[in-house]
UniProtKB/Swiss-Prot annotation:
Keywords associated with the record: DNA-binding, Repressor, Transcription, Transcription regulation
Every HTH tetR-type domain range: 18-78
Listed PROSITE patterns: HTH_TETR_2 (PS50977)
GO biological process: regulation of DNA-templated transcription
Native organism taxonomy: Bacteria, Bacillati, Actinomycetota, Actinomycetes, Mycobacteriales
Annotated InterPro entries: Homeodomain-like_sf, HTH-type_TetR-like_transc_reg, HTH_TetR, KstR_C
Annotated PANTHER family: HTH-TYPE TRANSCRIPTIONAL REGULATOR RUTR (PTHR30055), HTH-TYPE TRANSCRIPTIONAL REPRESSOR KSTR (PTHR30055:SF242)
Protein name: HTH-type transcriptional repressor KstR
Organism: Mycolicibacterium smegmatis (strain ATCC 700084 / mc(2)155)
Function: Controls the expression of genes used for utilizing diverse lipids as energy sources.
UniProt DNA-binding residue ranges: 41-60
Presence of keyword Transcription: yes
Any one Pfam family match given in the protein's UniProt record, by short name: TetR_N
Presence of keyword 4Fe-4S: no
């Protein structure tokens, strides 16, 4: 299947178009928050966003594109609200644990919404490759910048990719009730320790 282009915010020429895209994603998040993945239907999103269904499809070709784009926006929001002072100083272990904990709390706050966005991300096909890649890079960047006290190194980006995969795997385990929130925290702490060490025994 070929990649289907989604109109990103940077590609929208007018303020009206950017506002319309924002309304569409707001509507998607609101519907998913109350009903999960199955509740996100294109017609329902169009009605809540006050746009024509045809217009919605020009912005987002499917509900998968919608939900993966919504996940990307949520990560951007979390990143923008992160207290950089809390990430300053300390060790890579402390800073990365802070970021992992922040993401865990954000995603566990609304299980239905998280289930909808994560399900779309995990099962997206090649047509949504651009959106999936964007979300993956956002995760990697957040973790890599948390590890680094400046510009992340190539090795830190590689480690961040592994942390992203472990984090997503454990988020899925929590969503499917195969792991508790405590289990997830312990597993991720172990992964971080193995990859970058602790305050007493740093590896990077």
């Amino acid at each position: 299947m070929t990649n289907v282009a989604v109109l990103s915010e940077s590609e929208l020429g007018s303020e009206a178009q950017r506002e319309r895209r924002k309304r569409i994603l707001d509507a998607t998040l609101a519907i998913a928050s109350k009903g999960g993945y199955e509740a996100v239907q294109m017609r329902a999103v169009a009605e809540r966003a006050d746009v024509a269904v045809g217009t919605l499809y020009r912005y987002f070709p499917s509900k998968v594109h919608l939900l993966v784009s919504a996940l990307g926006r949520e990560f951007e929001r979390i990143d923008a609200k992160t207290d950089r002072a809390a990430l300053a100083g300390g060790t890579p272990y402390q800073r990365l644990n802070f970021m992992v904990g922040k993401l865990n709390r954000a995603m566990q706050r609304n299980p239905l919404l998280t289930e909808a966005m994560t399900r779309a991300f995990v099962f997206a096909d090649a047509s949504a490759a651009g959106e999936v890649d964007h979300v993956g890079k956002l995760m990697d960047s957040m973790f890599a910048r948390a590890m680094s006290d400046g510009e992340p190194t190539e090795d830190q980006y590689h480690i961040a990719r592994v942390i992203s995969d472990v984090w997503l795997s454990n988020l899925l385990a929590w969503l499917t009730r195969r792991a508790s929130a405590t289990d997830v925290s312990k597993r991720l702490d172990l992964a971080v320790r193995l990859l970058i060490g602790t305050e007493e025994q740093p590896k990077i």
